[in-house]
Amino acid sequence: MYQNPLKDSPERQSLVAILCAGIAVLAVLTPYDYHWTLYLSTHTIHGFAEFMNRSVFERSRLPGAGDLVYPPLIFALLLYIPSWLWKFNHRLAGGRFHTFLVSFRPLLGFTLMSAFSCALLFVHTTKQIMGRARPNEVFEGKLPFSQWYQSGPHFFTHGSFTGSFPSGHTATAAIAIIFAYVLLASLAGRRRWIGWTGLALSVLFTAVMGIARMMSASHWLTDVLFTLFSEWALIHIIFFRVLKIPEQQEYFRRHGRPQARPLFFELRIGLLLLLLCPGVWAFCTGLRSYSFEGWSWLLALTPVGLAWALFFLRRIRLALLFSPP
């Protein structure tokens, strides 16, 4: 029987600290959202902004800062898949590499699931729901300015759009925070300073990416701040509450084998989260429709989206409820 490592622990306090810091920073800096973004966009450092915004994985011709997080993700995927193969090929079992793969599998699954859930699903679903106009659209007089917590002028009935809130590039940079958590979970004793240094650098890298996006008039200050703190909090929750990585590691140390889980467990949870997103979108879009003239009938999407979301939330909950042997 394992006790929740978050009860009366630094991990819970850390989550509270992340959330409180994010709320405080947004509360203080929201009044300066428009003016600080305008200032940075008119005082841009072009070479810096262009490099930070580029990524060959997003069809850029030249590599850029956005490429830094993709090689570790690809490497994690290449290790994650064979980490399950020992179940089907006994010749792979027993060796040192097999032992390493199986013991490291929870961290590999955490890396892939967190990156998929936070940097992709959460960001793009929220973009479609909020519909906030980008700074360049506002500065050019094409669309009105709206606060980060308000419904923006974009709506799916107006055609395809990529909303400003939250920041996708900043969320991609925040994948570095995932790697820092992996380091902290892999190192012990005096070497943990490497993980803490990695965490500080990853937060700094995420913030710098956000500044570059503001310089290019692609995102508002609050887009960046919300993305940084929300992604960090979600990563923390997935690590300690959803996948319970410390408990999985402790189980392996005690028993010499991983907890019994379905094949590709973390990717299955990611797939369920993907299926959850349309329900969340439909529910929120139905609620937003009342503010767009002629589209109030879309309010009918709300109960449909709610039923869809509740169904897959239940599936996710059931998938997470299991008893280790």
PLM features: residue spans?
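N-terminal transmembrane-helix/juxtamembrane module of multi-pass inner/ER membrane proteins
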Residues: 1-90, 127-130, 143-145, 156-157, ...
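Structural signal for the C-terminal ends of transmembrane alpha-helices
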Residues: 2-3, 30, 78-97, 180-189, ...
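Interfacial segments of alpha-helical transmembrane regions
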Residues: 88-128, 192-199
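Membrane-embedded catalytic cores of phosphoryl/pyrophosphoryl-handling enzymes
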Residues: 148-298, 314
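C-terminal regulatory/interaction regions
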Residues: 289-325
